[in-house]
Amino acid sequence: MKRALSVKDILSKKYEVFPFEGKWKEAFDTPERTGVWFIWGNSGNGKTSFVMQLCKELCKYDRIAIDSLEEGTRLTVQNNLKRFGMAGVSRHLAFIKEDIPALKERLRRHKSYNIVVIDSFQYTRMTYSDYIQLKEEFPDKLFIIISHARGKHPKGDAATSVMYDADLKIWVEGYVAYSKGRYRGSTSKYVIWELGALENGSK
C-alpha cells in the first residue's frame, strides 16, 4: 500500500504545465500537460475554429495527433487548415482516423504523440467505462475530447459523465470558448472570432 501524502508533499510537488500567455492564459490559466480536456458545443458556434486555434497554440509545446473520426480528411478539414495557417505547425501536427483499439496500439509505441484530439466522442462509441480505461492506461498523455451537444449539455449520458470527469471543460457558444472546469484565468473566456462574437452578443 502506498503511503498517504501530506499537505507538505502536495505543496512541494512540481507539475508540468502549459505556460500559456496572453488571451490563452486569461481564459484557461496554465493547465497541466496531462489529463483530459473536454470541448462541447452546438454546430455553427465556432467549435471547429476553436479546436484549430487551440492545436496551433499547443503545437508550440508538443506534438499532436488529431483522431478525425468524424470528418476524416475531407475538404472542410483542408479549408480549416488553410484558414488558420496550420502549415506552419505541420511538423508537430498529424491526422489519423482510428478506432479506439487502434489508437491504443499507436499510443503504446515508443515516442508516441503526447497530445491526442478525439473528434468526436460520439463517433468513438465509447462507454464511460471505456473512457476510464483509456485515460488510466495512458496517464502521461493529454486527451482533448470533442463532443456534440444537445442544448447546452453534451449529447449522451456517457459524454456527460466524461465532461464531469474532465480537468478542463470548455463550452463553445457564439464564437466564444468558456472555461467551465478546474482551470480558469482572469476572464475564463476565449474569443474565437471577434465579429462573430459581437454579432451573437457574446462579447
Task: Tell me what each language-model feature is.
Residues R33-A102:
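Conserved P-loop
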Residues Y15-E32:
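Pre-Walker A adenine-sensing motif
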